[in-house]
């Protein structure tokens, strides 16, 4: 992969920086692993907006990615690496020895033709998946399960990874990129290495239209609205916020904790570092 600065042939392309990946497959994705993807445009079942700035965008198919990696002991060959419009990471198409094909999150350094395997006896090599109890302490991992057998939920985006810090009884401690240290059951699975496409965060979109292609709509400031639309709205002429920054629904926007899942608080050993 390489970062390419585009020629400033227009105002929209001036400053644009692309991530070019010549190893990615240029043809169509594997049809058997595609599903229809419907857009909610940020609305709930009542049609009310629950997530702002969503809507439009290019039509996409959902690529069914194997987050469980439960075909133990069966080697799989990497057929190709592909772009996935539904996530920041790239995906890899695996062909197992029994003929089945599955998509996985492509780890950093994975090459076409490499052989991957999952299970308790899998070697400690990038792309292989094992239960955490079989992974050496200090290993860099990604695609980590939070509940055994449920499938990977943590460290799945481009460039993401975690470090296995310790094992104590039936739980292990994992340090995430945010600085948070979590307890994870040792039967949970994780994949060796870190997620690829690590240069994704260095790209520059360049123009508003490129965000519209991705289904992201404009963000309007609260102070530019009417009082009925936002707590910061209204006033004669240009005015400040006149109160602490809040969301359109009155929730404080800075420093206010919104985590409600107290049931899993005991799984967090150390909170993430504040920016």
UniProtKB/Swiss-Prot annotation:
Keywords: Ribonucleoprotein, Ribosomal protein, RNA-binding, rRNA-binding. It comes from the Bacteria. GO terms for biological process: cytoplasmic translation. Residues 38-59, 223-275 are annotated as: Disordered. GO terms for molecular function: rRNA binding; structural constituent of ribosome; transferase activity. GO terms for cellular component: large ribosomal subunit. Residues 229-244 have a biased composition (Basic and acidic residues). Residues 50-59 have a biased composition (Basic residues). PROSITE patterns: RIBOSOMAL_L2 (PS00467). HAMAP family: Ribosomal_uL2_B. Part of the 50S ribosomal subunit. Forms a bridge to the 30S subunit in the 70S ribosome. This is Large ribosomal subunit protein uL2. The lineage of its organism: Bacteria, Pseudomonadati, Pseudomonadota, Betaproteobacteria, Burkholderiales.
